[in-house]
């Protein structure tokens, strides 16, 4: 069961990766409104990138290594004197828009948390911010945005409507944080050139030794295939009585 789930996850990652331009050697930025989601995302990325997780998280910085950053915008540093980013997304939207000029960042990870108390249309405000960032990017410096949506169909914002709004704008919506981390790392990883497979000698032509019916050899010759015919037949034509007589003669 676990192997099946992993296979499905990897298949989804590959499918997304095939539709996105690689951003090899670029950085990953994560701007999360949920502290638990930010911590899990940081741990997953640290594992995939072989980075030692940070023990201390000043200013909500859950991961800060090799240019990659995962930030918990719900940290006290960002919420003193202002509403939580789930309620007021303006700070995150500003940081997203600023990524338009930070071309070293190739992948942006986001969470969309819906429910009572959250802003009325989290996806809509995120899309506006992403479009501001995308407008400053060229085709040679894309910014891929990967998001997870936490909530249900019964929430006021409706999970499926939020997903549709994000996907229509060009945001990649994935099912889980592990899927988001795997896809992000795959996009920034240098593409390995596949080594050519050794050529089978069968592709260089076929030579046949035919034993038995001569008609097989004739058919092969007519097709231009080199063939050597060896005249052979079962002893005594399969007659057991004659076979025993021949054995005695030998």
Task: Give the positions of each predicted feature.
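Internal gly/pro-rich beta-alpha loop/helix module
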Residues: 1-20, 174
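Metallocofactor- and cofactor-centric catalytic cores in central/energy metabolism, strongly enriched
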Residues: 4-6, 89-92, 104, 115-133, ...
